[in-house]
């Protein structure tokens, strides 16, 4: 189960609306387990997975993932099984209600974003349009 993590010292009245939502983004157990494994390989327990949106790709926007040990004050932080997923407010507006998952199949393994806001996606699933 994912939980929203608030910033230390932040008051609910001062928090942006998205930070007070119960589940603005779903970070699955499968994704958290893979991230935890990758963080252990890196040897830095302060790392979190950051997901972001940037212009590009064949459909106009594309997803990006990176490890980050710096959390901005306005980042959304979602925790699942002790692993943190970070999203900046600009990216979150495109990811509201989305699910970040990790899948393995005969064709390979990958992080997958199931985004209800995307009108179209490319064949590989890494870019989308609104």
From Swiss-Prot:
One of its GO terms (molecular function) is iron ion binding. Keywords: Iron, Iron-sulfur, Metal-binding. Binds 1 iron-sulfur cluster per subunit. The keyword Coiled coil does not apply. InterPro entries: FeS_biogenesis (IPR000361), FeS_cluster_insertion (IPR016092), FeS_cluster_insertion_CS (IPR017870), FeS_cluster_insertion_RrpA (IPR023063), HesB-like_dom_sf (IPR035903). Signal peptide: none annotated. Belongs to the HesB/IscA family. Required for insertion of 4Fe-4S clusters for at least IspG. This is Iron-sulfur cluster insertion protein ErpA. The lineage of its organism: Bacteria, Pseudomonadati, Pseudomonadota, Gammaproteobacteria, Lysobacterales.
